[in-house]
Amino acid sequence: MSTQPIITRFVLTEKAIRLAEKENTLTIVVPRSVNKKVIKDYVEKAYKVKVIDVRTLITMEGEKKAYVRLSSENNAIELLTNLGLL
């Protein structure tokens, strides 16, 4: 795994906040060349959380968006708040 940060930005739309609250899921934008395994490893190491699942999609704008579901031991809203994003 590269030591470079792979998260381009966090998505903080109404839908993303709702997913964080109800499904404990972070929504992030990553480079298109990054795969699910790399995303999972990076999020676990960088934020010291346990990742259960990673789902990805390519948006109509050509960005790769990843939905990263955290274990119940970790709280997505709390993580976003600690990062100063909420």
Curated annotation (Swiss-Prot):
Protein name as annotated: Large ribosomal subunit protein uL23
One GO term of the biological process aspect: translation
GO cellular component labels: ribonucleoprotein complex; ribosome
Pfam families, sorted: Ribosomal_L23
Subunit structure: Part of the 50S ribosomal subunit. Contacts protein L29.
InterPro entries: Nucleotide-bd_a/b_plait_sf, Ribosomal_uL23, Ribosomal_uL23-like, Ribosomal_uL23/eL15/eS24_sf, Ribosomal_uL23_CS
Annotated gene: rpl23
Keywords: Ribonucleoprotein, Ribosomal protein, RNA-binding, rRNA-binding
Family named by the database record: Belongs to the universal ribosomal protein uL23 family.
Function recorded in the entry: Binds to 23S rRNA. One of the proteins that surrounds the polypeptide exit tunnel on the outside of the ribosome.
Species in which this protein is naturally found: Caldivirga maquilingensis (strain ATCC 700844 / DSM 13496 / JCM 10307 / IC-167)
GO MF annotation terms: rRNA binding; structural constituent of ribosome
